[in-house]
Amino acid sequence: MKLANKKMAVLTAASLVLSSVIATGAMSAANASTKVLNFYHDKNGWDVRFNAVSAGLKDGIGVSLKPSTYADTTLYQNTLNQATKTGKGPDLLTWWSGYRMVDGAKGGMFADISDVWKDAIAKGDISKDLQKQFMVGNKTYAIPNGVSYWPMFYNKKKFAEWGLTVPKTWAEFEAVCAAIKAKGVTPLTASVDGAWPSFIWFEQLLISQDPKLYLDLTSNKIKYTDPKVVEVFNIWKGMIDKGWFTAGDTSFFGEEAVKLMNKGTMIPVGTWNNSAFSGTGGLIGGKDYDAFVIPNINPALKTQSIIVEAGAIGALAKGKNLAASKKALREWLKFPVQAIWADASGDGVPNPKVPVADPVIKGLSKYVATNKVNQIQRYWESGPVPLIENGVVILGAFMLGNKTVAQTTTELAALADKEWAAWTKKYCK
């Protein structure tokens, strides 16, 4: 979908929202009583999406959003941690699921919204299976900010021009990388920009080699110095040495992602970035570009695996508009707002009543379901926060050639021992 079409779709959704208000004869009353909620997030370039949602919320319940973007994730987390103590900050905020949700919930950041989930599940607006990712103990603290797969995006026209097909095995994947490299194009996107992206290839290679190995590592059942983990690092090192990855300061969001795509570089990223191609880039999904599940390294594996990211939106526990915030979260899960979000984001949504329209997301979702692809939680949400945040710095140093495999695995193992012990002491008494 071209940018003009994407904007038109969002404007159309907003127009429908406005029309329904006029139809009820309640336009002036709705405007007069609109509650504005401060909404903090770290999703750079997403304000257009959140503004579209705001229009839907305003129509449905007379509540609108005032988005504030924090492009730096570290600054964002520090700001929210301070707001948790003072109550001076947003009404609604984006966060992360998994271990990060535990820290936020137990630290008093989030309000309990179990009642929101109870009603949404009863009305068929969301699956109960998703709820556990946002639970701490027997309480639920957030709703999904979309549920995104992490496939490999690729330039479909370049593949055709170069005589390439979607790889089904690791050998075929390596052959594709070598062929793209031979064309003078760097085949794979990798980055340490902002630190966090350094985990992308680490998690992917682990699940492609052995998803159980990944799950055991992220649940502290094995160490980073385990021979099987070291083997994955050696595979990664081999790919680095072949010159298959982009420079460490590469950005792969928005316009930069489009530039990479147009060159023919493949991009492993969450489907939340799909709109960068279909919106900003004006590319047509399924025609100009597409996505595939990365093949297994280990041919003995019977099924493929894909990383899944479940972002979170919650209400600040000490927020001044808590009742309105909870009401907004419930409305967010209903069909009208979810349909707007699906169109504005170009991604899938958690409400099963909303059909998947985007051809790339539709095709990927069908492939995952048909082939029973293992869906595995992202590394960023899969361990104690200090372990992950300090760990990505070590991984980044490895990617840049500043640490050997032995140094990297040894340092990660020591860090894991320290942070898992601290986590156990803090939360597992």
Predicted segments with their positions:
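Conserved N-terminal structural module of periplasmic/extracytoplasmic solute-binding proteins
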Residues: L3-K7, L11, S19, A23-V102, ...
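Conserved C-terminal helix/tail region of periplasmic/extracytoplasmic solute-binding proteins
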Residues: K35, A160, K372-K429
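A structural signal for short loop-to-beta-strand junctions that line the ligand-binding cleft
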Residues: Q82-A83, P90-D91, I121-K156, T186-T189, ...
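Hinge/lid segment of periplasmic solute-binding proteins
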Residues: G98-W150, E174, W201, A291
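Short, solvent-exposed loop/beta-turn-alpha elements that line the ligand-binding surface or hinge
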Residues: D112-I126, L188, V192, Q209-E231, ...
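Extracytoplasmic/periplasmic solute-binding protein
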Residues: G137, Y141-N145, W150, E174-K221, ...
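Extracytoplasmic/periplasmic substrate-recognition and gating elements
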Residues: W162, K242, T280-S345
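Glycine-centered hinge/linker elements that transmit conformational signals in sensory
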Residues: S219-D249
